[in-house]
Amino acid sequence: VSQDNNIQLSVDKLLGSTCGVTLIKRGNYALEPTVRGLNAGQINTTIDGMQMFGACTDRMDPISSYVESNNLSSINLNLGPNDEQFGSSIGGGFNFKLIKPQLGAKKFVSGSLGAGYETNGNAYRGLAMVQLSKNKWAIQANSIYRKSNNYLSGKNREVLFSQYEKWNFGVSGIVQLFKNNTLSVDYLQDNGSNIGY
């Protein structure tokens, strides 16, 4: 994931363009990623190496829905059954690596703003990121808000209860304690409301 080029894309769109990954669409919100046809308990899904489990038993909100592209520095995909670093599973898995602030950046204050609109579902989104950076410490905050009405099917029929609204907020800080030692803290919150399936 390149932060500059893909910050406007959803995680679903980033995963959908990855070889070996297909997405299961059950509604307008949160497509479920599969690795070579395997999903759920057959694949490992982690955020910064931390094992995650979906809250919904029918997989309507997969782990990939808890992060946004502006939270991420990269998405690591393992296509095989071995992954010593984040745990093994029969189908491989994903590790969503959170973006970290940069110590000693060229500018003390930097950031970005973005907005997007999709005609189907009258969907819009807005995002922001700000970073403060010194040689010994840095902090970064990012947020995104997305809202969509019911979308239209291929035959131009309204799919009822396919609306959603969500916001996502992340903050990360890092302090250099010694020459080769740093302390970092991450916070990520994702809230969805009025989500129809």
Segments the model singles out, each with a brief description of its role:
Residues 113-117, 132, 141-147, 185-189:
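Transmembrane beta-barrel strands of outer-membrane/channel proteins
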Residues 12-51:
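Extracytoplasmic beta-strand/coil segments of soluble accessory domains associated
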Residues 22-23, 51-81:
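Short acidic/polar hinge/loop motifs at secondary-structure boundaries
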Residues 67-112:
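A beta-strand signature from Gram-negative outer-membrane beta-barrel systems
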Residues 31, 90-92, 109-111, 124-128, ...:
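Hydrophobic, lipid-facing positions within transmembrane beta-strands of outer-membrane proteins
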Residues 116-124, 148-175:
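Outer-membrane beta-barrel proteins
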Residues 160-162, 180-197:
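Flexible loop and strand-edge segments within Gram-negative outer membrane beta-barrel domains
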